Amino acid sequence: MLTMNNLLMVLVQALRQHRWLCLFGVAYIFSSVGNGLTQTLILGQLLRWHAPPSTLTLTYMLATLPGFIGSYLGAMMYFVTYYLGSASYFMWMLAAHILGKAAGSLLAKRLTRNFNKVQIFGYCAVLAGVLSIALFFAPKSVFVLVPLTFIISTLYQATTTLMWVMMADVADYGEWSQGKRMDGIIFSTFLAVLKLGMALSGAIVGWTLGFSGYVANAPEQTSLAMHCIVALFTVVPGLLSLAAFATLRWYKLDDQTMQEINLAKMQTIVKG
């Protein structure tokens, strides 16, 4: 998000000096709307086809790849540069993150064969949250941070994969309770919340660093700025992961409930 914020500040300054550049802003807005509609249509169709979670996850990752590069990797670069003291460790952290995401998708698929997916989501969210917060207190050593990053990324990706399974369950529940599928509405709502979360996270990062006295490109940062940089990369994601676990108390579509719903749908089809 830091990289994205810096680029946006340059854009705002350019718009102030050259009003005609506003045309590019309008074009960007229409492009974003078109991109959102495309993602909604594609993923909505995949849900109607009952595509496997791995396909949904891969489609989502490809659709959000530019935002991922501009936000998470930017934050990781600042964390590595100022906390570990050398940007050369960035590739190690990035490799651990990418391998963790691949392992998380495989882990979720294997666990859902024998365990309740809602419980697995909760366990992974809690473990990811606790380990992410523990990362704040971990020794400043690449030999500790890289393995922890791999484990945390694995757990986060497992929850992401399970989220798509749960979204498909919501679509099936909507069809059972309302008599029609609402895949487009479900995904477009999710996408809108996702975009809102990305916007708020970028704003929170900028406000926090501004409050902490962060100075861009400075060889050293103040103690408060350093703590904020590390907290934004560790504690904040951990707390949000724990908050995601807390919301499961309102999610009632466990495996047993979905079996009953699918059975009722099959009986309706047979009678019809």
Swiss-Prot record:
<dbReference type="GO" id="GO:0015293">
    <property type="term" value="F:symporter activity"/>
</dbReference>
<dbReference type="Pfam" id="PF13347">
    <property type="entry name" value="MFS_2"/>
</dbReference>
<dbReference type="InterPro" id="IPR036259">
    <property type="entry name" value="MFS_trans_sf"/>
</dbReference>
<dbReference type="InterPro" id="IPR039672">
    <property type="entry name" value="MFS_2"/>
</dbReference>
<dbReference type="GO" id="GO:0005886">
    <property type="term" value="C:plasma membrane"/>
</dbReference>
<dbReference type="GO" id="GO:0008643">
    <property type="term" value="P:carbohydrate transport"/>
</dbReference>
<protein>
    <recommendedName>
        <fullName>Uncharacterized 29.9 kDa protein in crtE 3'region</fullName>
    </recommendedName>
</protein>
<comment type="similarity">
    <text>Belongs to the sodium:galactoside symporter (TC 2.A.2) family.</text>
</comment>
